[in-house]
Amino acid sequence: MIHAFIKKGCFQDSVSLMIISRKLSESENVDDVSVMMGTPANKALLDTTGFWHDDFNNATPNDICVAIRSEAADAGIAQAIMQQLEEALKQLAQGSGSSQALTQVRRWDSACQKLPDANLALISVAGEYAAELANQALDRNLNVMMFSDNVTLEDEIQLKTRAREKGLLVMGPDCGTSMIAGTPLAFANVMPEGNIGVIGASGTGIQELCSQIALAGEGITHAIGLGGRDLSREVGGISALTALEMLSADEKSEVLAFVSKPPAEAVRLKIVNAMKATGKPTVALFLGYTPAVARDENVWFASSLDEAARLACLLSRVTARRNAIAPVSSGFICGLYTGGTLAAEAAGLLAGHLGVEADDTHQHGMMLDADSHQIIDLGDDFYTVGRPHPMIDPTLRNQLIADLGAKPQVRVLLLDVVIGFGATADPAASLVSAWQKACAARLDNQPLYAIATVTGTERDPQCRSQQIATLEDAGIAVVSSLPEATLLAAALIHPLSPAAQQHTPSLLENVAVINIGLRSFALELQSASKPVVHYQWSPVAGGNKKLARLLERLQ
């Protein structure tokens, strides 16, 4: 049978009540206990789950409904649960030692007075009340993150349209994850700082993408959630467009990564055009969409979270290196490789980056010869007639490198350093000497940038790390792969043109939060030393929305 009682005028968040429900369900002579606020949606849930009691007809959204399933008919069971509930609520009010300093208020005005620099409202109340609170936040020029779900599509469109008109951002509804300016919002991870700005219409998608970025040794600037419906045909990607504009204006976000559930096709095209407008290297992952091309201008398409993370990290490293070098903006690329397969892959990759065709005939080891860009395989038979392979004797390559001193139109030199048994004792040292001769023969305004990969292991006779150190100490850029080497070379010759720099939005510089709903979110922000005020909201006028709006206007 069901025992029941109501605790009047004691609004609590749903997570706290679920925890209390589990604790009370462990009581003696009790099968199960359900503790919920008396909202219409919760009453319907109590009915469908078999916990309904007619006493709940008198409950308002500010009242706690307690339903106890027990085989015993003893009325004292309800009394015992009532006492335990009072104790649980008392402990909740007192909180832990870390929560005693949490600033708590019961009115909007008080929240804004306590935190005058507030620029974000984090809303996690029942969906039927969330939209009204979000509008009130927009009234106060606050950005909004709506963790709440069960918000109508019409309300979402209205809120996001209004926010965009005001130059604000609405994340959500049903937005579970954001990490902005180092501030963890709802479900978030502690991320290393980097130069990748993340946008997502998928909470766990953002978390997995960011986790993979961290595992690869890179970091993020921000991760902006949108809510799962943002890229639907009806919503039209309103918040996605705002987020892209915000990160476009953020100097620290040099690379962008975007992940979403399957979008409407018209919206996808609109978002891709907005990505292009940023001018920044951008990785786009539209789950369920198979791109016709791997790259469209400054937009790289991925087909999985793992691939998106790897691409973002690759672009992150390339962009950081490119920005650390004086722009070339013209000139040609020359690749002098000792390994045939390495030369072939480098040629194919570079041809794709430059929009040219790789050489099909490979005459005299010429793997690429287009628009004055060349990739040559010096291990080709043409170069080994009467002389050792260049991995054994690097004399020929070193001479060709030195000869580049008289070819100032060549601005970027691609190289491989292959070590191991059979290879020359110190290929890096002889390569550095040849490159330095070429550089010395040029004018100061005619630099020759060198980019190298090293093939081999730490246990090889030449020692991988020692070879890398020799190259880097001389000023040669050492990268981990041919895709990174060729992409960096192309980026130096043909750099992307970011959109005109704008002022970084204040939200991306510092986040100060008015938390409305789940107390745990405020405690987590406090533990992260982020400015937060907890607004202990409860339904106004007993949940009567018309009367609540009237009272709001009278204030």
Swiss-Prot record:
Optimum temperature is 30 degrees Celsius. Its EC number is 2.1.3.5. Disruption phenotype: The deletion mutant cannot produce oxamate during anaerobic allantoin degradation. However, the levels of oxalate, produced via a glyoxylate shunt, significantly increase. It is an enzyme of class 2 (transferase). Optimum pH is 9.0. No enzyme activity is detected at pH 6.0 and 7.0. Activity increases in the pH range of 8.0-9.0. Pathway: Nitrogen metabolism; (S)-allantoin degradation. Component of a carbamoyltransferase involved in the anaerobic nitrogen utilization via the assimilation of allantoin. Catalyzes the conversion of oxalurate (N-carbamoyl-2-oxoglycine) to oxamate and carbamoyl phosphate. Its cofactor is Mg(2+). It catalyses: oxamate + carbamoyl phosphate = N-carbamoyl-2-oxoglycine + phosphate. It holds the Pfam family Ligase_CoA. It comes from the Bacteria. This is Oxamate carbamoyltransferase subunit AllF. Oxalurate could not be used as a standard substance due to its unavailability, and the enzyme reaction was performed in the reverse direction: the synthesis of oxalurate from oxamate and carbamoyl phosphate. One of its GO terms (molecular function) is succinate-CoA ligase (GDP-forming) activity. GO terms for biological process: bacterial-type flagellum-dependent cell motility; tricarboxylic acid cycle. Belongs to the AllF family. Induction: Induced by allantoin under anaerobic conditions. The OXTCase is composed of 3 subunits, AllF, AllG and AllH. Keywords: Magnesium, Transferase. NCBIfam families: PRK06091.1. InterPro entries: CoA-bd, SUCC_ACL_C, Succinyl-CoA_synth-like. GO terms for cellular component: cytosol; succinate-CoA ligase complex (ADP-forming).
